[in-house]
Amino acid sequence: MGKQGLNIGLIGTGNMGGEIARIAPEKGHNIVAAFNRNRPLSEDSFNEEIDVCIDFSCPECVVNNVCMLANWGVPLVLGTTGWTARFAEVRAQVISSEMAIVHAPNFSIGVAVYLRIVREAGTLFNQLPDYDVFVHESHHRRKVDSPSGTALAL
């Protein structure tokens, strides 16, 4: 990357996509293409300027997006949740194409630390048969996936 930022293809222009579009230029990166339900990723939408795609779209779109980007040789940061029922299919595509991909249910450093703490707590609670652990989450009314990918990771 050096001093020049990345040229980003943004897949999904909802809440997270909007935040990425807002923050990327502040960090020196360029949004060179944006895809959404009205303008989905397709063979006709290839843009050779794209260095990496960031996907916060919908679970139903993930397999198509991964296949398309693998064919183009474009790395992917995947933040979309709710698609893991098709994990084996995505994994096979990634392996066969040697695609570069990073995926997580949540990219927050705070959540990453919290997940590690929860793992440790789980080990301790497993030794206490009188305790049942559960997760309760609440969100704004427009939250699309419930339970969230973060809650499922916990």
Outline where the language-model segments fall.
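Conserved anion/nucleotide-ligand pocket segment
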Residues: 113-154
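Glycine-rich adenosine-cofactor-binding loop
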Residues: 7-20, 110
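Rossmann-fold dehydrogenase core element
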Residues: 75, 90-108, 128-135
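Short, acidic/turn-prone active-site loops that include or flank metal/cofactor-
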Residues: 36-40, 80-84, 107
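Rossmann-fold NAD(P) dinucleotide-binding segment
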Residues: 46, 52, 56-80, 87-93
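Rossmann-fold NAD(P)-binding glycine/threonine-rich loop
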Residues: 80-103, 112-121
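NAD(P)-binding Rossmann-fold cofactor-contacting core
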Residues: 19, 23-43
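Short, hydrophobic beta-strand segments that form beta-sheet elements in well-ordered domains
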Residues: 10, 31-37, 53-55
